[in-house]
Regions:
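Short beta-strand edge/turn micro-motifs at domain boundaries
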Residues: 98-121
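Short, solvent-exposed coil/turn segments at beta-strand boundaries
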Residues: 24, 72-75, 99-106
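Short, low-complexity N-terminal intrinsically disordered segments enriched in polar/charged residues
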Residues: 1-30, 122-124
Length: 124
């Protein structure tokens, strides 16, 4: 399953560049959990949708550049640099992501770890 799980995550990361909430949401299970650490946890597809809509509001471009990927079974970890332009600001942020993928290729859990202070310095 590791190769398929890696492809799901790679496709998911690539989908963000289209800024299409429907496409992004199609990757999640209904009861998925998204934790953009250190932010609050988003539980369930409806709450995740609202969170992602908030992230994309004012965003004119976004790209997840995957630097490294490791997978064991249905768990995929990736080191990324997420770059986006929103509200007149350009942000480039190192991120470590952990994804749990179901056997049918949906994301049931997604945790991203990043330095909030680094982000805040770039958006001020």
């Amino acid at each position: 399953m590791a190769v398929q799980a890696e492809k799901v995550v790679s496709d998911f990361c690539g989908a963000w560049s289209k800024l299409n909430v429907e496409e992004i949401m199609s990757f999640f299970t209904d009861d998925a959990v998204y934790h953009n650490i250190p932010m609050p946890v988003a539980k369930g597809k409806a709450v995740i949708r609202k969170t992602i809509e908030g992230l994309l509001k004012g965003t004119v471009s976004i790209k997840f550049d995957i630097v490294h990927t490791a997978a064991a079974g249905n768990v995929v970890m990736n080191e990324r640099v997420d770059s986006f332009e929103a509200n007149g600001k350009h942000v480039s942020l190192p991120v470590m992501g952990v994804f749990e993928i179901t056997d049918d290729g949906k994301i049931k859990a997604w945790r991203d770890y990043f330095d909030l202070e680094s982000y805040m310095k770039q958006v001020r």
